[in-house]
Amino acid sequence: VSAFEPPRYTTLTDVGVKRSHNQDACAAKPAVDAATYASCGHIFIVADGMGGHAVGEKASVKAVRDIPHLYQKHVHEGVAVALRRAFAETNAGIHEIGQQNPEFRGMGTTSTALILRPEGAWIGHVGDSRAYRIRGNTVEQLTFDHSWVWEIARRTGVDPDELGDFKRNVIIRSLGPDPEVEVDIEGPHPVQPGDVFLLCSDGLTGLVKPEEIGAIVNVLSLESAVRLLVHLANLRGGPDNITVILVRVPGGPQDADSHHRSSSPLARFRRTLSRHWPVWTILMGSAAALLSLLFHLQELKTVSLPLFLLASLIILVGIIGLVHSILRAPAETSGPDIPLTDPEMEQPRTLNIYRQHDCSITPERLNQFCEIEQQLITTLKEHNISVDWDTHAQLAAPADGDLRDAFRLRCEAILLLADAFHKARHKQESFQPSWTTPNQR
């Protein structure tokens, strides 16, 4: 992303159905200006605590608070180094708390941080929380699960799904239990306008398929999409806390109207003029100086001398503006802003995409969501739960053969019904329908 424009993002964390306390945490720290964006970038982070109610919550909150702060503190050393140091120092701090307080012994947390900068997307990662990139009809998993299942799958060369559910929730790497931790640093992944990045705890990915995630994100606003994703996880049992962050890179289809307005010929001319005014000023001054020379050769000194002085002044203003633009360039450049002292950038980095999923909207996926809607309608009516049925009827109108629009309407209808279910769930915790849980994580 070449020019500074704040990304659109939304966050949501939910305790789930079965848990009494929320041990997840998340934070968003978008850059406030172009200089901060170029030096630090936009920061987003999720964490999934473990070790008991208060213990896990303390660990995850500390992670989402300390990692962004420490990253910003060390970013002058390079992005990769800063991320690694931020995770390592946070791990040491959590571990020390566990060692000094017997009631906190064994406290830990996963953590996945996303840094969006001019050169691309960086990810720091420990545990089995995940980062995805949704681009068009493809969902890409950008992190490796530090779980027993994924490690065995890596060593044996098989798909993690082939190992079933045995020890699926056993993680082999987290912040806190040990004095040192190995941190995965991914990136910088190229970023395109309209890309959506998703960070989440395993409370989402254990119950909602990546294909479903991508399809939902592609048809709903970020705010509606994050609510529907959390609702789906809860409707399918909600055994764990659920946390989701969605970040949309500016310039995609959702920004088409504003992009069109800013891309008019007059707007482009104004932007070009504002960016390159020092050069134009110097050229104008040079033209005036040349004209004064012609007047001088024609012995029109009363005209040539004032014109030459004016030309000199114009050129001087242009040179001052050019120097000022050069000094400001590092804060607004579209290229990488990676210090040469960063030892991890001396060699080309491998951009890992651990899994890819097709999230195209198909008739089968539409039918699946129609079934979810019908199951939800039946359950809500059986329990006499109040719903705005008039609004639901409007959403049930046919989409005239447009598959994408039909899927969007089904998502909006499910969201309306799930909101009502969510309110009733808090009043009557024993009310739980039986939902189909996908096998793939």
Describe the residue ranges of each PLM region.
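PP2C/PPM-type serine/threonine phosphatase catalytic domain
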Residues: V1-H383, V387-Q394, R408-E412, D419-R441
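Hydrophobic/aromatic side-chain positions at a characteristic register within alpha-helices
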Residues: I361, P398-D402
